[in-house]
């Protein structure tokens, strides 16, 4: 048994209001710079929809994640080593800029400089790539927000597989939910396996997946290898970049920027202990519907004396074990079985999990318009958001875990409503879903009224175990380019002119200001 610790995240989709605060703050802190204008390490999608980049869930097109061979051995869907190297100079499944969107700004200066005329001047869009004016903005990272666009395009959502999706195009049957997305910091990351330069690594102390900017050579195989498409190419520096899980904040015991600024308080951060020796076996499970349960078996109980003893022997700090015992992520994912992984069928064993949404369902149930099958709780299988859709998103098509999570959340609400409104303690609903009164009270505290220290339980890092960086910090500093010498190197493998900054406020062409 090889015990490792991982800082994981759970997002409660039942409380997400789609305000995009997490996206904006993450963008301002980490990717609001040249070469990364199109990149959003955190973005919020409206489901159903094809997402950002377009159709990112279609692995038949993008070849991300792992595939299980006949022998039971895992191979990147992109191909083995020989296959990856054979297309290193021309990757046929690399997303183009049009699959993301053409980043743009507006010609605000024209509002001040426009000559006096008959009509008010307007701020027209201008490309941040070419510097030219754009006739029309046709796509963006949140283009489908609030079900924007016609259903015919949103119906290409891969989560509609094995469903009669035509009926959900009708107004009476339509539904929506928000899905905040960031790098999953997987236990079995396919981006690490597909990088020819070996520049991507997973930190042992907290499981955060990072890209070594000095080793990265810009082959961009990691972009194709990542099934969640959360690695981006910086065209200015010629390097790949991704969400770093705000590791400078994590090291000091602070939550990530997206978690800190979340308006709905939907995010939970905590430590999980896992057995690294079980990863290959879990990811190689034959049936995709079993992957969720197999991943749960990888996690270790932090309250087990045998696990604690072995963890201390293997060098896991005591404060990390204490944090794992108080982890809200472990409670939501393992104790109560409410949180589920995003697309476990990719076999990467993701570590950012989601609580399925119940709010749009519960309002219908309260109206008494749903069958209850003779039980206290209504039949969640017949509610507005299709259970099969949520299962395709969160449990590889297996509706069992989704039904269990939804029923337990509904039972908690039924119990608390009878307690606060009717003044009685009705335990029939929670008994149906195998929950005790103590568990439900704790669930209510964490899901509804959790304090800051309940949602974020992050141990500080042990600097005494790290190498002394004093000789490096004065000469290197913090850069986003080619190591210590910034991003102005003239070296180019293909002997072509390097792309430099484009001044989008340059002199307008004749007739543009009219």
Language-model-detected regions and their locations in the chain:
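Non-ligating segments of multi-cofactor redox enzymes
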Residues: 1-514
């Amino acid at each position: 048994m090889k015990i490792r610790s991982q800082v994981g995240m759970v997002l409660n989709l039942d409380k997400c209001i789609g305000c995009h605060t997490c996206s904006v703050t993450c963008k301002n802190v980490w990717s609001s710079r040249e070469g990364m204008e199109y990149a959003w390490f955190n973005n919020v999608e409206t489901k159903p929809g094809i997402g950002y980049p377009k159709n990112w869930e279609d692995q038949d097109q993008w070849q991300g994640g792992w595939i299980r061979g006949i022998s039971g051995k895992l191979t990147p869907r992109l191909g083995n080593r020989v296959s990856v190297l054979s297309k290193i100079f021309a990757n046929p499944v690399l997303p183009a800029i049009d699959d993301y969107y053409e980043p743009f700004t507006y010609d605000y200066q024209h509002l001040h400089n426009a000559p006096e005329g008959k009509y008010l001047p307007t701020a027209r869009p201008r490309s941040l790539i070419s510097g030219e004016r754009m006739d029309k903005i046709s796509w963006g990272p949140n283009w489908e927000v609030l079900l924007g666009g016609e259903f015919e395009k949103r119906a290409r959502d891969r989560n509609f597989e094995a469903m009669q999706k035509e009926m959900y195009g009708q107004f009476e049957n339509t539904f929506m939910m928000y899905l905040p997305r960031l790098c999953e910091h997987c236990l079995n990351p396919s981006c690490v396996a597909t990088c020819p330069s070996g520049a991507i690594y997973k930190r042992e102390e907290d499981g955060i997946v990072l890209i070594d900017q000095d080793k990265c050579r810009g082959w961009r195989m990691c972009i194709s290898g990542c099934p969640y498409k959360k690695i981006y190419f910086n065209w200015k520096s010629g390097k790949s970049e991704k969400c770093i899980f705000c590791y400078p904040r994590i090291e000091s015991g602070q939550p990530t920027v997206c978690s800190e600024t979340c308006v709905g308080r939907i995010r939970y951060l905590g430590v999980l202990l896992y057995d690294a020796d079980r990863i290959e076996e879990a990811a190689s499970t034959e049936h995709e519907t079993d992957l969720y349960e197999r991943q749960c078996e990888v996690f270790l109980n932090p309250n087990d004396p045998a696990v604690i003893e072995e963890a201390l022997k293997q060098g896991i700090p005591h404060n990390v074990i204490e944090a794992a015992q108080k982890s809200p992520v472990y409670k939501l994912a393992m104790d109560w079985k409410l949180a589920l992984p995003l697309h476990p069928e990719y076999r990467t064993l993701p570590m950012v999990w989601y609580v399925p949404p119940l709010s749009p369902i519960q309002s219908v149930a309260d109206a008494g318009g749903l069958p209850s099958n003779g039980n206290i709780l209504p039949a969640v299988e017949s509610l507005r958001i299709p259970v099969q859709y949520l299962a395709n998103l969160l449990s590889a098509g297996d509706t069992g875990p989704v039904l269990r999570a939804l029923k337990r959340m509904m039972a908690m609400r039924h119990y608390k409503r009878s307690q606060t409104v009717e003044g009685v303690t009705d335990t029939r609903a929670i008994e149906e879903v195998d929950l005790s009164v103590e568990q439900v009270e704790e669930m209510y505290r964490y899901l509804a009224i959790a304090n800051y220290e309940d949602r974020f339980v992050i141990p500080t890092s042990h600097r005494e175990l790290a190498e002394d960086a004093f000789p490096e910090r004065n000469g290197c500093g913090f850069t986003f380019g080619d190591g210590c010498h910034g991003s102005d190197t003239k070296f180019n493998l293909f002997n072509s002119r390097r792309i430099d900054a484009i001044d989008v406020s340059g002199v307008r062409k004749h007739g543009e200001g009219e």
